[in-house]
Amino acid sequence: MNFETIIGLEVHVELNTNSKIFSPSSAHFGEDPNASTNVIDWSFPGVLPVMNKGVIDAGIKAALALNMSIHQHMHFDRKNYFYPDNPKAYQISQFDEPIGYNGWIDITLEDGSTKKIRIERAHLEEDAGKNTHGTDGYSYVDLNRQGVPLIEIVSEADMRSPEEAYAYLTALKEIIQYTGISDVKMEEGSMRVDANISLRPYGQEAFGTKTELKNLNSFSNVRKGLEFEVERQAKILRSGGVIRQETRRYDEASKGTILMRVKEGAADYRYFPEPDLPLFEIDDAWIEDMRAELPRFPAERRVSYIKDLGLSAYDAGQLTATKALSDFFEQAVALGGDAKQVSNWLQGEVAQFLNAEGKTIDQLALTPDSLVEMIAIIADGTISSKIAKKVFVHLAKHGGSARAYVEKAGLVQISDPAVLIPIIHQVFADNEAAVADFKSGKRNADKAFTGFLMKATKGQANPQIAQQLLAQELQKLLD
């Protein structure tokens, strides 16, 4: 029997506000334990939450970016549960009226086809703290993360393969990153994924019993965990077994999933409206103000790069991987840079430099105008492509004008025959053995002279002109 895979994803995204959702404590990552806390985070008696407007701004932007409807009469709810990292014994979240609902995004699969994935809801909530279990037998609670603003984005169960889940996460991360509301760094916990997966026989309408997957710390692990679950559940069903409703975690060492707990039924969190926060009215003007702050999103940019600039789909995809890279590219083209040449540099030397330095493009001293200027002085013969790589490294580290640096550093390409011919004659004089080989008929010996000349000019000889002049002067040796 063959089975259809049913996947839905829940994605928690930390919003990059300066302060927490209901307290003035810093929301920044990496502080010493409990350094970013105050009486609200510790839930001292009598303290009250104060709404951070920037969180609602971010929620509106996310909802618009994900093609969602917005609840304009929005409230918060209490989600009741006890855990040491939750000192109030409840979490302030949203239940029946999330800020966004009924959305969708398009995903692109590996074969180039596209699919629309529906999004059920996006709701705002506060994050919990973090428990650490020490080797000394004690458990420690760090409340720095308590109250950090989150938006949870819940998809419909529209994905039918691990590949589609991977594509959905890739597209979702791109969109959220473009809005500027989060850096979506999984390694820092600002994007966290839970997956729900079930199988059903083809043709059956009802969903099968789902398994929830946790500990998915990369998109690759999401895909691997789901692939393992497809095989595990199919094997059980084909042998006549029954799938239990479980929570499992992905284990990188075994490349499989491990049981965490069996779910007997749905958790009863006893939601009720948060009495310490008012109803929030989100009027049309507020929504339009947030819409005006949104950029062009990657899908629209890719279409433009292909249609208007003549780039390949691959190049367009690479250039829109991050908003910073895409903005840099567009600024360079607007300054007169050739789209294909700018693209080649960004995907070649620039990408290699960023990877080696562990930086992003907005951390470089290189500016779009200096890159365009460098491309121009390659085209007009001022420098060679080889010298340009050296120039680029300087600009990436120190910035400034490409032409000014080339002139100051003495890197201008030598193209004048009146300068090159005497150097060629000196090369002949310094390499008599090679000249003798050439004269004796060893025609391949002429290739050595190119290297000798480039060494003598420190790589500054114009390659095309140098080759022409070498051929001319070598011929004279035979005449």
Curated annotation (Swiss-Prot):
Q: Per the record's keyword annotation, is Aminoacyl-tRNA synthetase included, yes or no?
A: no
Checking Pfam families in the record gives: GatB_N, GatB_Yqey
Q: Which SMART domains match?
A: GatB_Yqey
Name the enzyme group at the top EC level.
ligase
UniProt protein name = Aspartyl/glutamyl-tRNA(Asn/Gln) amidotransferase subunit B
Q: Which organism is it from?
A: Streptococcus equi subsp. zooepidemicus (strain MGCS10565)
One Gene Ontology term from the biological process aspect of the record: translation
Q: Keyword set for this entry?
A: ATP-binding, Ligase, Nucleotide-binding, Protein biosynthesis
The record lists the catalysed reaction(s) as: L-glutamyl-tRNA(Gln) + L-glutamine + ATP + H2O = L-glutaminyl-tRNA(Gln) + L-glutamate + ADP + phosphate + H(+); L-aspartyl-tRNA(Asn) + L-glutamine + ATP + H2O = L-asparaginyl-tRNA(Asn) + L-glutamate + ADP + phosphate + 2 H(+)
Family per similarity comment: Belongs to the GatB/GatE family. GatB subfamily.
Q: List the disulfide bonds.
A: none
One Gene Ontology MF term: asparaginyl-tRNA synthase (glutamine-hydrolyzing) activity
Task: Establish whether keyword Ligase is in the entry.
Answer: yes
Would you say which domain of life the source belongs to? Answer: Bacteria
